[in-house]
C-alpha cells in the first residue's frame, strides 16, 4: 500500500517579476508572442510545452502535455493522432483549455477556446518536416490504445522503418494538426505572499478584447 504524502510545508515565494496593466497591449496575442519569445530566449525547460485539457460531451475531463508548433492567425497549433483519447474527445466536444507553465519565469498563460482540425495540406506540410523516425512512429502507433508489450511496438517500428528506407514516408490519415481559437486568455505572474498578478482577456462579439485584473 502506498504511504500517505504530507506536502503542506513545501512552498516557495515568487518575487522575480511583476506584471502591470500598462504593460499589456490591446491584443493578447501580442503578449503571448512576447512571453513565448522570452521563454525561448531564457532557455526555460520545454518552452513550447502546453497542457491541453479536453472533455467528453458529458463533462469527463482528461489532460496531457503536447508541443505548440505555431501561433498563426491568432490560433494555437499542435499535432496529434486523431484516434487518440484527446482526438476522440475533441471530435465530440470542441471546447478545450490550454496552459503554458514556465517555472523559471514564474509565469503561466491560460487559454480557453474551441479547436478545429487543420486542412490535409497543412498537416502534410508539417509532417514532411518531421524527422524520419518521428514520421514512422506516427504511422505505427495506435495512440492511447492498450498494447501487449514494448517489444510489440518496437517490432512494428522496425518493420515500418525498413518498408520506407529510401522512400518518402506519407502522413497517415489518422494523424494531423489542430488549431485552438481562443476566447479567453489569462496571463499569470507569480508574486510574493501569493498576491499574484493576473490579467484576463475575454473576446467580445464585435471582435475586441475586454481586459480585467483578477484577484490572486
Annotate each predicted stretch with a short phrase:
Residues 1-216:
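Binding-site signature for planar aromatic cofactors or substrates
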